[in-house]
Amino acid sequence: GTGILSFELAKWPGELIAIEPNDEMRGKAVDTLKGLSNCKVLNATAEKTTLSNNSVDLIICAQSFHWFNPGKAKIEFQRILKKNKKVAIIWNIRSAETDFEKAYEDFILKYAIDYIEVKRREFRGNNLDQFFKSDSYEEKMFIYDTYLTFQQLLGRTLSYSYMPNLDHPILPAM
């Protein structure tokens, strides 16, 4: 992704390796993580990370699992994880209950490039039983409110993979 979560995780001790196959998203991540000596960003995929066997303490997939080939990603995760280490699969699920949230969802539906496809993939990705199969997993949900300035909301909106790029002709209409 764009490195938003990676920036926060980089505050933890240890090395952080971000995997991003998309050139534009990876470029944003490199900019976001610039100057952080414990971070590196790789041009790779969840299914082929290029990392060494048994080299990773924790894998965190934030807003990305729906892009993976689950079977191949699981094999890769098992290869790179150290023994008895963990995988965290994270989604931010946006509420659409208030008038503002409903209007924002309508805005996204109007201007997004492939939002319906991404939402369909996210739903499929939520079936963690298939990914973990006989391995045990724990599901936790945390409810939280986020208060954003207009600039923060704009930045978040433009960071979604399904929203137009900054050079897209529809951007001025947004």
What residue ranges belong to the model's regions?
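Class I SAM-dependent methyltransferase SAM/SAH-binding core
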Residues: 2-49
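Short conserved AdoMet
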Residues: 10-14, 34, 69, 82, ...
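Conserved catalytic/acceptor-binding region of the Class I
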Residues: 78-146
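A short beta-strand submotif of the Rossmann-like class I SAM-dependent methyltransferase core
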Residues: 58-62, 70
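C-terminal helical/coil "lid" or tail adjacent to the Rossmann-like core of SAM-dependent
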Residues: 137, 141-174
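A short, conserved alpha-helix within the catalytic core of class I
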Residues: 68-77
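A short acidic, Gly/Pro-enriched loop at the edge of an enzyme's catalytic core
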Residues: 47-59
